C-alpha cells in the first residue's frame, strides 16, 4: 500500500464546474471563463472530466478535445476535498471514499459527499469507503512514505472529534502505507476557510523537496506564522523552495487567499495559480528551475480565490490504471 505523489502518471483530472445553484452565482460567467482558461492549459497534456448538474455550462468546453462531461449534482466546486483519493496496491489502484462535512460543517455538503459512488460506477473504480472525515487538500504525500499535514485541520474537533492524534496517525499510516508523518503547527493563509489546508501552505515537488509559502513583509499579517512554519520545515531534513506570497489582493473589501502553492501536477506539466502580481513571473521561474523536465504554466486565479480556493482545490487527480 502506498500513497501516490501527485507527479506520478495520471489517467485524467476531475474538475467540478460552478453552476447557478452554488455560491458562484453572482459571478458565474467570470468563473466559468476562469475554468475555460484552466481546461485549455490542461488538455494538451491530460484528459479532463468536467462534472456539473447544468449541462448548459458544458457548451463552452465542447471546443476542446480530450474532455469528457458528467452530469451530476454538486454543492460546491472544490473536488480536491470531496473527490476519491487513489492509492497504489499490489493488486493495482484502489480509491478511498472518505466522509466529507464541508470543512467542519461550514456549508451544505450532502451532494458532494455522495459523488464518489456515482463516479466510481462511471469510471469502474474499486472504491473503499472510509469511516473518517478527510479532505484531499489536507494531506500531501511524497510518494515514498511521507505525509505532510497540519494540526489545525486534521486535529480540529470539527472533523474527527472522537479520534485522538495517535488514533488519527494510526489510521493514516495504515491507509496510506506511511513511514513518517510531518505535522506543521504553524501557517495560515488569510481568506482560507479550510482550517489551514496543507495545499495552501507547503507541497512536495520532488520526493526530497518541499515548496512552501513564504512572506518577507514584516507588516503583513502572515509574516509571523509563515516564519514559524518555515522554521518547522527547516527541521524536517527536506530541501526547501520558498515561494513568496503575492502582494495583498482584495475583493469586496475582503483579502483573498492568494498562494502559489496551490498548483496542480499533471502529466508533463505543472499548472500554477497566478494573481496579476509582480511575483507571478518570479515564482514560475523558480518552479521552472526546480522542475526542468516539466512545462510550467500559469493560470490566472483571482476569480477562483473569491470563494476561498484556487487551482489545486478545484481539481482531483486520477492515477493511471495498468
Which residues make up each language-model segment?
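The feature marks the mature, well-folded catalytic cores of soluble enzymes
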Residues: 1-322
Amino acid at each position: 500500500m502506498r500513497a501516490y505523489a501527485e507527479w506520478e502518471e495520471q489517467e485524467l483530472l476531475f474538475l467540478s464546474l460552478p453552476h447557478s445553484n452554488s455560491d458562484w452565482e453572482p459571478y458565474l460567467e467570470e468563473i466559468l471563463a476562469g475554468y475555460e482558461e484552466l481546461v485549455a492549459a490542461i488538455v494538451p497534456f491530460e484528459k479532463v472530466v468536467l462534472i456539473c448538474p447544468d449541462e448548459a455550462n458544458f457548451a463552452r468546453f465542447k471546443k476542446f478535445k480530450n474532455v469528457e462531461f458528467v452530469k451530476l449534482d454538486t454543492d460546491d466546486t472544490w473536488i480536491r476535498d470531496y473527490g476519491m483519493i487513489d492509492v497504489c496496491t499490489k493488486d493495482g489502484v484502489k480509491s478511498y471514499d472518505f466522509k466529507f462535512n464541508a470543512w467542519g460543517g461550514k456549508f451544505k455538503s450532502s451532494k458532494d459527499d455522495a459523488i464518489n459512488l456515482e463516479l466510481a460506477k462511471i469510471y469502474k473504480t474499486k472504491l473503499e469507503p472510509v469511516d473518517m472525515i478527510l479532505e484531499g487538500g489536507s494531506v500531501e504525500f511524497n510518494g515514498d512514505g511521507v505525509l505532510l499535514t497540519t494540526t489545525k485541520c486534521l486535529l480540529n474537533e470539527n472533523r474527527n472529534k472522537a479520534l485522538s492524534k495517535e488514533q488519527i496517525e494510526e489510521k493514516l499510516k495504515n491507509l496510506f502505507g506511511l513511514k513518517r508523518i510531518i505535522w506543521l503547527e504553524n501557517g495560515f493563509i488569510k481568506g482560507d476557510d479550510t482550517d489551514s489546508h496543507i495545499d495552501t501552505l507547503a507541497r512536495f515537488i520532488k520526493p526530497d523537496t518541499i515548496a512552501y509559502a513564504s512572506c518577507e513583509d514584516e507588516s503583513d499579517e502572515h509574516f509571523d506564522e509563515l516564519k514559524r512554519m518555515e522554521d518547522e520545515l527547516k527541521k524536517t531534513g527536506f530541501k526547501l523552495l520558498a515561494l513568496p506570497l503575492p502582494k495583498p489582493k482584495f475583493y469586496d473589501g475582503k483579502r483573498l487567499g492568494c498562494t502559489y502553492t496551490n498548483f496542480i501536477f499533471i502529466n508533463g506539466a505543472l499548472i500554477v495559480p497566478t494573481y496579476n502580481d509582480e511575483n507571478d513571473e518570479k515564482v514560475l521561474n523558480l518552479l521552472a528551475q526546480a522542475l526542468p523536465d516539466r512545462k510550467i504554466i500559469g493560470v490566472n486565479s483571482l476569480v477562483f480565490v473569491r470563494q476561498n480556493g484556487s487551482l489545486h482545490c478545484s481539481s482531483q487527480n486520477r492515477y493511471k490504471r495498468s
